[in-house]
From Swiss-Prot:
Keywords: Hydrolase, Metal-binding, Zinc. Its cofactor is Zn(2+). It comes from Bacillus cereus (strain 03BB102). This is 5-methylthioadenosine/S-adenosylhomocysteine deaminase. Catalyzes the deamination of 5-methylthioadenosine and S-adenosyl-L-homocysteine into 5-methylthioinosine and S-inosyl-L-homocysteine, respectively. Is also able to deaminate adenosine. The keyword Nucleotide-binding does not apply. Belongs to the metallo-dependent hydrolases superfamily. MTA/SAH deaminase family. Zn(2+) binds at residues 65, 67, 216, 304. Substrate binds at residues 94, 150, 189, 219, 304. The keyword Metal-binding applies. It catalyses: S-adenosyl-L-homocysteine + H2O + H(+) = S-inosyl-L-homocysteine + NH4(+); S-methyl-5'-thioadenosine + H2O + H(+) = S-methyl-5'-thioinosine + NH4(+).
């Protein structure tokens, strides 16, 4: 099946960050086979021609760190620091989740993400009461591209920890697929919730199965103090001593890093998922993304969960990410528009090991989203496309979402998820949770 999308303004995010003002994209099944300017007069014979009527077409956004199973917990635990937020709000509520609640919560997060332009994401979920097979099946039905990872903790007995490791390794072997729509990573929660033995076992699983690692690291000053007091090392050095960086690793946050740590992370191909809104809301601080990029660290933007954000709008994350760097460095050139877009598209895709997506180029997967600026005053005059995408647009502006060549959202309507049922069930299950 060959489909041509014509009469579009195409934000390619190729090496030159080229914007084609009047162009077309040809998709064959799940791949882009042509991106060009001008009127469609290709040598390709196509099955369908779709007039985009001047819509902006850009790569689908890539969210490098989420917890979609927590989507029912939006608005619970506002105005709290990270540790009391986790210990008195989030974990007690998550412990009440059944597999049915987890699926309903996940569906809500998927619906929010895909309708606001996210096509790929990397997720960590708490396995208490949760069937990973059910979560993976739910994500698969949505049509989204994802790395969904079972989070490991050292809660309970040593026997509990051993069982958690066995379960995690089983799922890694079952679901790891570097080039597929769904994959997984090894995901120890953090240095403060995992024993040394557990972190070492996670490193072993990653090496033996050649998978990536996903972990919260250096998120707060308290974490750094506590880990240093307990182990005599800061979190980065401690994680390295456990062997975690033997495989490509994504660290969520990296708010509290020094110059030596940034250089070390770059040298060991450790990537950072930057969660600006979540870090601000939990009072964790502001990650120095400018310094990370200068050190050579791969960075991708992320939302974290709705419980700490409180939405999954990647446009909002792009905007706050660039504004924060300008503010903390008192440098208006810090994190310019093109860089912010890169960190939400092709750069983010590289962070989570999905190089097959993130830009609109021949050979890439057909993952793209559209915005119609014609009826949106906040996107007018419409000629400064890149600027408007970062500083003015929002997830509510999305018209269409194509993932792997399939129309997942079309004219604002999600084709893969039952929006009315999902919202009803989310409200019903939320009322049943005991605070």
């Amino acid at each position: 099946m060959k489909t041509t999308y014509v009469n579009a303004t195409i934000v390619t995010m190729n090496e030159q960050n080229e914007v084609i003002e009047n162009g077309y994209i040809i998709v064959e099944n799940d791949k882009i086979i042509d991106v060009n300017s001008g009127e469609f007069a290709s040598d390709f014979e196509v099955d369908e021609v779709i007039d985009m009527k001047g819509k902006w077409v850009l790569p689908g956004l890539v969210n490098t760190h989420t917890h979609v199973v927590m989507s029912l917990l939006r608005g619970i635990g506002d105005d709290m620091l990270l540790q009391p937020w986790l210990e008195t709000r989030i974990w007690p509520l998550e412990s009440q989740f059944t597999s049915q609640i987890a699926v309903a919560s996940t569906e809500l997060g998927l619906l929010e993400m895909v309708k606001s332009g996210t096509t790929s994401f990397s997720d960590m979920f708490n396995p208490i009461g949760v069937d990973q097979d059910a979560i993976m099946e739910t994500v698969s039905r949505s049509g989204m591209r994802a790395a969904v990872s079972r989070t490991l903790f050292s809660f309970g007995t040593k026997e509990d920890e051993k069982k958690a490791i066995e379960e995690a390794e089983k799922y890694v072997k079952r679901y790891y697929n570097e080039s597929g729509m769904l994959t997984t990573m090894v995901a120890p929660h953090s240095p403060y919730t995992c024993s040394t033995e557990l972190l070492e076992e996670c490193a072993r699983i990653a090496v033996e199965n050649q998978t990536m690692v996903h972990i919260h690291l250096s998120e707060t000053e308290r974490e750094v103090r506590d880990i240093e007091a307990q182990y005599g090392k800061r979190p980065v050095e401690y994680a390295a001593s456990c062997g975690l960086f033997k495989r490509s690793t994504v660290i969520a946050h990296g708010v509290v890093l020094n110059d030596n740590e940034r250089a070390f992370l770059a040298e060991h191909d450790v990537r950072v998922a930057h969660n600006p809104n979540s870090n601000l809301k939990l009072g964790s601080g502001i990650a120095n993304v400018k310094a990370m990029l200068e050190a050579g660290i791969k960075v991708g933007i992320a939302t974290d969960s709705v419980a700490s954000n409180n939405n999954l709008d990647m446009f909002e994350e792009m905007r706050i990410a660039t504004l924060l760097q300008k503010g903390i460095h008192q440098d208006a050139t810090a994190l310019p528009v093109e860089t912010a877009l890169t960190l939400a598209t092709k750069g983010a895709a590289e962070v989570i090991g999905m190089k097959q997506t993130g830009s609109l180029e021949v050979g890439k997967c057909a993952d793209f989203i559209t915005i119609d600026p014609s009826n949106k005053p906040h996107l007018q005059p419409a000629d400064e496309v890149l600027s408007h995408l970062v500083y003015a647009a929002s997830g509510k502006d999305i018209s269409d979402v194509i993932i792997n060549g399939k129309r997942v959202v079309w004219n604002g309507e999600c084709k893969t998820l039952d929006e009315e049922r999902i919202i009803f069930e989310a409200s019903r299950y939320k009322r049943g949770l005991q605070r």
